[in-house]
Amino acid sequence: MNEPFATSHGTILIREANPADAVQFRDLRLYALQDSPTAFSADYQRNLSHPPQYWEEMLTMHADASSIFLARHENDLIGMTGIARGNTPKTRHSATIWGVYVRPEWRGLHISEELIHACFHWAKARKVVAARLGVTATNASAIRCYERCGFRITGTEPRAVYYEGQFHDFYLMYCPLDNL
């Protein structure tokens, strides 16, 4: 983590977010919710109404509970994802990866995979042994990305998202972290 990697578009740095990233994180999150509305259960209008302190608090380190990782090229925020560990003694061994997004012009460069691997590193440092996520069932490129990272489809959540008069199913995916 925090090791830059080269792409055909330039060098990318993946790192944990902090409150100083709040404005750029908000902008990217809102952009993502408009660009790919069926990929997220979050809603653009609701997120738009959040005050600045909401975004700062979201990026405050929560130590063992959760984190957000950002992909940067120079001063531009180009990708993001979050991870949240189970919050009870019976679920602390697992974590949910959420909000994976890379700007369209940066896709195809394995940035999402690097973001996910940063989540894996964070999780393993906290003795988390399994990760899970949900992905829109029609998002073939995201599914392939997650499979390259070690995830496998374990089920379907029918009608997980409702957007503009249509329901969208999510595939539920699981990745054991023991052998990574």
Where are the regions that the model predicts?
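C-terminal "cap" of GNAT-fold acetyltransferases
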Residues: V129, T136-I143, R148-C149, R159-L180
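Active-site acidic-Proline motif in GNAT/NAT acetyltransferases
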Residues: R103-L109, A137-T138
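Terminal substrate-recognition subdomain of acyl/acetyltransferases
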Residues: N2-T11, A17-A20, F167-L180
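Conserved GNAT acetyl-CoA-binding A-motif
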Residues: I116, A123-G134
